[in-house]
Swiss-Prot record:
This is Acetate kinase. Mg(2+) binds at residues 14, 373. It comes from Mycobacterium marinum (strain ATCC BAA-535 / M). The keyword Disulfide bond does not apply. Its cofactor is Mg(2+); Mn(2+). Belongs to the acetokinase family. The active site is at 137 (proton donor/acceptor).
């Protein structure tokens, strides 16, 4: 009798400048075989000098769990790539030509794309016999309506330099909107949804009938909601003002807006659990930071209610969205006249998994939906394998 074939698995890699997250996932069952995160890559005190060493460490971790990539049913390596620009909006089989084009997109995402491209090169060298596939954060928002995607700036400049609203966290927004429809037992085409992805990076989207019609992030992941270290929406005049008066260079300003702004800039803390403790201790900076975060979030919810006209579902996801009941409560407070009423008991319940937290008589259903970007990436990879 022949041995049964192992279930197919995809190794999903999500590379940052100093970190490498990985998950070995079965796209058909949704089961995770292994997951982990290599941090502090390249730091002086780290034992992991570069991404080559980090990926080799991933293989060691898998081997320690008795997982052999050669015999476990590995069918693809999926790479999360933050920015696909105008040209990449489908899961894409990686080759030298594609990787070269991704390198050229680095100015659009200087903090995110270079480490992803580096990881792709290392992974292809270490696993040369397995298809490597890029899945883009921007893909879901590729077909935003022109009125939502277009910035009101000089059209020639915008066309030459490919300036538009690209949107990010698209894999999460797509997955959560699909899971919300499945939870409600309704066709996604019949639902108008608002998805709030709230983590250290945060974004909102409006999804009509399964297609995005608005999102908060723009040309880069810097626009939109207040985030852990990013400012979100900002008067562009601030950049010129700091350049002229504070004598800061563009790179310094960009670094400040990405790494020393948001909750960290306002309160000196980006972790919401520690921020909550600071608020409980009466820290005025922490209180203000929280108020600014909630105010911005409520503005976007209100705007998207108007954009959609009729809203069926609001879903919270990602670390803060899934686990911080106070954020959910304060975001939707006083919106009963807009059709949104929370059930306080349901909202405060710490149970995991997809769940309804709105009142039974709320015209708009409010859900908590755990995101699973790795599973979504793995399934996108399999769609490419079917097509080739």
């Amino acid at each position: 009798m022949s041995a049964s074939r192992p279930n197919r698995v995809v190794l999903v890699l999500n590379s940052g400048s100093s970190s490498l997250k990985f998950q070995l996932v079965e796209p058909d069952s949704g089961m995770s075989r292994a997951t982990g995160n290599i941090e502090r890559i390249g730091e002086e005190s780290s034992s992991v000098p570069d991404h080559d060493a980090a990926l080799r460490r991933v293989f060691e971790i898998l081997a320690e769990d008795d997982i052999d990539l050669q015999s476990c049913g590995l069918v693809a390596v999926g790479h999360r790539v933050v920015h696909g620009g105008k040209d990449f909006y489908e899961p894409t089989l990686l080759n030298d030509a594609v990787i070269g084009k991704l390198d050229e997109l680095s100015p659009l995402a200087p903090l995110h794309n270079p480490p992803a491209v580096l990881c792709i090169r290392v992974a292809r060298a270490l696993l040369p016999d397995v298809p490597h596939i890029a899945v883009f954060d921007t893909a879901f928002f590729h077909q935003l309506p022109p009125a939502a995607a277009t910035y009101a700036i000089d059209r020639e400049l915008a066309d030459v330099w490919k300036i538009r609203r690209y949107g990010f966290h698209g894999t999460s927004h797509e997955y959560v909107s699909q899971q919300a429809a499945e939870f409600l037992g309704k066709p996604i085409g019949d639902l108008n949804q608002i998805v709030l992805h709230l983590g250290n990076g945060a974004s909102a989207s409006a999804v009509a009938g399964g297609r995005p019609v608005e999102t908060s992030m723009g040309l880069t992941p810097l626009e939109g909601l207040v985030m852990g270290t990013r400012s979100g929406d900002l008067d562009p005049g601030v950049i010129g003002y700091l350049w002229r008066t504070a004598k800061l260079g563009v790179d310094e300003i960009e670094s400040m807006l990405n790494h020393r702004s948001g909750m960290l800039g306002l309160a000196g803390e980006r972790d919401f659990r520690r921020l909550r403790a600071m608020i409980d201790d009466g820290d005025p900076a922490a209180e203000l930071a929280y108020d600014v975060f909630i105010h911005r979030l409520r503005k976007y919810v209100g705007a998207y209610l108007a954009v959609l006209g009729h809203t069926d579902v609001v879903s919270f996801t990602a670390g803060i969205g899934e686990h911080d009941a106070a954020v959910r409560r304060d975001t939707l407070a006083g919106m009963a006249e807009l059709g949104i009423s929370l059930d306080e008991r349901r909202n405060a319940c710490p149970s995991g998994g997809a769940r309804r937290i709105s009142a039974d008589d709320s015209p708009v259903t409010v859900l908590v939906i755990p995101t699973n970007e790795e599973l979504a990436i793995a399934r996108h990879c399999c769609s490419v394998l079917v097509a080739v």
